[in-house]
């Protein structure tokens, strides 16, 4: 019996009960007290997140499977962000596929129909054959499940760094729609309701919550990875939505399996469950295996006795297993029986109140180098534009059916944000952002930066952010420097979210992301922001002769930038100036609404040069006068590659549009810095440089397909 509980925690349990727990009871406590389910090392700090707002229908609430935001006309969007990092490191196909399945079940547990997915993937450098194997199978797993179940992938991220060599990050966000008055809770409020389980229970995913709450130890943990079955998942999706108004609560059986799902659903009430009534995929499972199995495509419903028959008949019509396995009781005891014998009897007060930890912190010593490396300008441009993080993701997106369901407005990769249509006719933009290189330098500024970047990304299509879900991914929280990075990232995310008025309605924390030598990954907090188009949306367009206009002010803040990663760090990290971020984003949205611009791109990874790449790869050239870039430095390298926030590149076809932008700027810098040329794949710089980027553009289109062809 392998547990994630510490010896001190085991002693706490013994003292609370006044006895030695049975083996099955240890499994129950281990699942509910796991880091994965209890947030025991993070919850103290997560309380600083803003979770209330005029659009919040369901925020960060205990045991709710997803958050919800009001989008008008009686409709709500349901948001959830999850990961399957540890499973994907062992079995990338099933790890990624079941991550998609889990997020979809979280959405339908609120009675919402899933309409969009995002995937944010980080693996090690692709010169390593195992990393290529991981990437190919992760993408294949996502496509297998998403395509089979009919939910489009509308946006995402794909990035590479040696920090993820042993521990890839596979984040999936889901979005669904539901009438506000039809949202189903995940917890019960009364005793006497029947517990109805659908789906078969097998051996896969045994102890998955405990597995995700400790360091990876090797491929011998394959049994902790769940097996995906999207065709069963499609039945669960359709029938759950069909019977959602006939039940009192719905819960997906995710991390921790049956024991976690039912205990959280009880929300302090008692339960009595007969394990031998559970439909099994494998004969002769032990009670302990049944309790903590994480077999996929299973849901639990709280149902009034008189409605049990119609609920089960709906599933049985498709020959999908459905069974009444117990009921919620008036006491506070969590009881599981097997063939008439009680195998678990634990108080909910023990299970739902794990110890909370506030580990020691040690301030990370951030290095600031003010001596600029000797960098050749042309070499820098070519190195940045060839970097794998910036290449086309079409190889991945082409494996997803991103237009299924008819709600996709912009194809993935077409703009900085995904854009989907809602049932009320409104358009919703959604985007995920992380910046581990910056977080490794300063996790507080990184927390602020990623929220601001997500806000900018939405602005490029004409949308204003309305809410956030987050995922905080770090190493071992007991290591003081790691825990310091976590605490500081939370502080930064909380500050920026409050400032932008984008409450955090859900999230997840994933610790113990380390390589085989125990070295933690770069801190990788991730936010996914949703926003509503305010009036018009912008489909990016590029024309010869269009003016290239920079909105915002460039600063010599090179720390954590892509240039610094390649050539060596220098300068301080970007300081996120929230007022500039807000004003520049509002200016872009207003320009879109008034038809003043035809293209918008936020300046982030790769700086100005990175922001110009979408123009170059569409068969155009650019001419840039670096003297016209508003900046606090004369250093051309900094002007071209700084990644400080609050900045955009926009294109305009009329000269008077520039005057209009200046008149509406409210103190934000607006400057024409160049124009789009017809000379394909060429960048002209004022310094007399004509840089032919044909090779880099070809690399942009072909890199992922070629590197994964082995």
Curated annotation (Swiss-Prot):
Places the protein is found: Cytoplasm
Residue positions binding Mg(2+) 2: 106, 252
Protein name, UniProt field: Phosphoribosylformylglycinamidine synthase subunit PurL
Quaternary structure and partners: Monomer. Part of the FGAM synthase complex composed of 1 PurL, 1 PurQ and 2 PurS subunits.
HAMAP family given in the database record: PurL_2
Species assigned in the record: Sulfolobus acidocaldarius (strain ATCC 33909 / DSM 639 / JCM 8929 / NBRC 15157 / NCIMB 11770)
Catalytic activity: N(2)-formyl-N(1)-(5-phospho-beta-D-ribosyl)glycinamide + L-glutamine + ATP + H2O = 2-formamido-N(1)-(5-O-phospho-beta-D-ribosyl)acetamidine + L-glutamate + ADP + phosphate + H(+)
Primary location group: cytoplasm
Active site: 36, 84 (proton acceptor)
Pathway where this protein functions: Purine metabolism; IMP biosynthesis via de novo pathway; 5-amino-1-(5-phospho-D-ribosyl)imidazole from N(2)-formyl-N(1)-(5-phospho-D-ribosyl)glycinamide: step 1/2
UniProt entry keywords in alphabetical sequence: ATP-binding, Cytoplasm, Ligase, Magnesium, Metal-binding, Nucleotide-binding, Purine biosynthesis
Protein's GO biological process: 'de novo' IMP biosynthetic process
GO cellular component, one term: cytoplasm
Functional note: Part of the phosphoribosylformylglycinamidine synthase complex involved in the purines biosynthetic pathway. Catalyzes the ATP-dependent conversion of formylglycinamide ribonucleotide (FGAR) and glutamine to yield formylglycinamidine ribonucleotide (FGAM) and glutamate. The FGAM synthase complex is composed of three subunits. PurQ produces an ammonia molecule by converting glutamine to glutamate. PurL transfers the ammonia molecule to FGAR to form FGAM in an ATP-dependent manner.
Annotated ATP binding sites: 39, 80, 470, 507
Pfam families, alphabetized: AIRS (PF00586), AIRS_C (PF02769), FGAR-AT_linker (PF18072)
Molecular function terms, GO-annotated: ATP binding; magnesium ion binding; phosphoribosylformylglycinamidine synthase activity
TM ranges: none
Domain of life: Archaea
Keyword Cytoplasm listed: yes
Enzyme class label: ligase
EC number: 6.3.5.3
Binding-site residues, Mg(2+) 1: 82
């Amino acid at each position: 019996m392998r547990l994630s509980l510490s010896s001190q925690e085991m002693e706490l349990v013994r003292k609370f009960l006044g006895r030695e727990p049975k083996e099955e009871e240890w499994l129950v406590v281990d699942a509910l007290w796991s880091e994965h389910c209890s947030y025991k090392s993070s919850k103290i700090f997560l309380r600083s997140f803003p979770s209330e707002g005029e659009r919040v229908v369901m925020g960060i609430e205990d045991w709710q499977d997803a958050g919800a935001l009001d989008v008008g006309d009686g409709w709500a969007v349901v948001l959830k962000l999850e990961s399957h990092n540890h499973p994907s490191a062992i079995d990338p196909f099933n790890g990624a596929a079941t991550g998609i399945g889990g997020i979809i079940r979280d959405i339908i547990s609120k009675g919402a129909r899933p309409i969009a997915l995002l995937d944010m993937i980080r693996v090690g450098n692709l010169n390593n054959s195992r990393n290529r194997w991981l990437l190919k199978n992760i993408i294949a797993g996502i496509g297998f499940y998403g395509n089979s179940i009919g939910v489009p992938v509308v946006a995402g991220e794909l990035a590479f760094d040696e920090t993820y060599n042993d521990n890839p990050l596979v984040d999936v966000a889901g979005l669904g729609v539901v009438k506000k008055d039809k949202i189903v809770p995940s917890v019960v409020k009364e005793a006497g309701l029947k517990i109805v389980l659908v789906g078969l229970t097998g051996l896969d995913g045994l102890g998955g919550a405990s597995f995700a709450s400790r360091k990876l130890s090797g491929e011998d943990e394959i049994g902790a990875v769940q097996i995906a079955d999207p065709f069963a998942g499609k039945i669960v999706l359709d029938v759950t939505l069909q019977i959602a108004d006939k039940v009192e609560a719905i819960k997906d059986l995710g991390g921790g399996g049956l024991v976690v799902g039912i205990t959280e659903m009880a929300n302090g009430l008692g339960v009595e469950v007969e394990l031998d009534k559970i439909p099994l995929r494998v004969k002769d499972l032990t009670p302990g295996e049944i309790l903590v199995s994480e077999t996929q495509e299973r849901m639990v419903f709280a149902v009034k006795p008189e409605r049990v028959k119609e609920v089960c008949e709906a599933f049985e019509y498709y020959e999908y297993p459905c069974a009444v396995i117990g009921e919620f009781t008036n006491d506070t005891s969590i009881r599981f029986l097997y063939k008439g014998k009680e195998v678990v009897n634990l108080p909910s007060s023990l299970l739902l109140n794990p110890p909370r930890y506030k580990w020691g912190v040690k301030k990370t010593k951030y290095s600031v180098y003010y001596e600029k490396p000797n960098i050749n300008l042309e070499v820098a441009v070519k190195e940045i534009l060839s970097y794998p993080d910036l290449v086309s993701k079409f190889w991945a997106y082409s494996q997803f059916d991103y237009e299924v369901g008819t709600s996709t407005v912009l194809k993935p990769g077409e703009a900085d944000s995904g854009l989907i249509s809602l049932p009320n006719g409104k358009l919703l933009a959604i985007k995920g952002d992380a910046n581990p290189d910056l977080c490794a330098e300063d996790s507080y500024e990184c927390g602020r930066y990623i929220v601001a970047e997500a806000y900018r990304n939405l602005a490029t299509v004409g949308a204003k952010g309305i809410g956030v879900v987050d995922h905080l991914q770090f190493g071992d929280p007991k290591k003081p420097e790691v825990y310091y990075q976590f605490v500081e990232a939370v502080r930064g995310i909380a500050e920026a979210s409050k400032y932008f008025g984008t409450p955090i309605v859900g999230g997840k924390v994933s610790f113990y992301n380390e390589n085989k030598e125990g070295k933690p990954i770069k801190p990788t907090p991730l936010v996914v922001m949703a926003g509503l188009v305010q009036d018009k949306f912008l489909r990016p367009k590029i024309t010869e002769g269009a003016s290239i206009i920079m909105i915002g002010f460039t600063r010599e803040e090179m720390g954590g930038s892509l240039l610094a990663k390649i050539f060596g760090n220098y300068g301080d990290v970007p300081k996120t100036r929230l007022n500039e971020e807000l004003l520049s984003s509002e200016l872009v949205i207003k320009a879109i609404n008034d038809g003043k611009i035809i293209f918008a791109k936020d300046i982030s990874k790769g700086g100005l040069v990175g922001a110009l790449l979408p123009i170059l790869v569409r068969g155009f050239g650019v001419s840039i006068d670096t003297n016209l870039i508003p900046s606090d430095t004369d250093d051309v390298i900094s002007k071209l590659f700084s990644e400080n926030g609050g900045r955009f590149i926009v294109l305009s076809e009329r000269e008077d549009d520039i005057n209009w932008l200046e008149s509406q700027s409210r103190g934000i810098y607006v400057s024409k810095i160049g124009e789009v040329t017809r000379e394909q794949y060429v960048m002209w710089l004022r310094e007399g440089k004509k840089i032919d980027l044909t090779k880099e553009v070809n690399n942009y289109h072909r890199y992922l397909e070629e590197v994964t062809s082995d």
